Amino acid sequence: LLKELWKKIKGAGKAVLGKIKGLL
């Protein structure tokens, strides 16, 4: 359960970083 949550958090983090890089 904790690992699945961690995967979702990491996935969301990558998505945010991707959007930031896209804006730059």
From Swiss-Prot:
It holds the Pfam family Antimicrobial_9. GO terms for biological process: defense response to bacterium; innate immune response. Expressed by the venom gland. It comes from the Eukaryota. Belongs to the ponericin-L family. Has a broad spectrum of activity against both Gram-positive and Gram-negative bacteria. Is inactive against yeast, erythrocytes, and insects. This is U1-poneritoxin-Ni2a. GO terms for cellular component: extracellular region. InterPro entries: Antimicrobial_9. Keywords: Antibiotic, Antimicrobial, Secreted. It comes from Neoponera inversa (Ant). It is found in: Secreted.
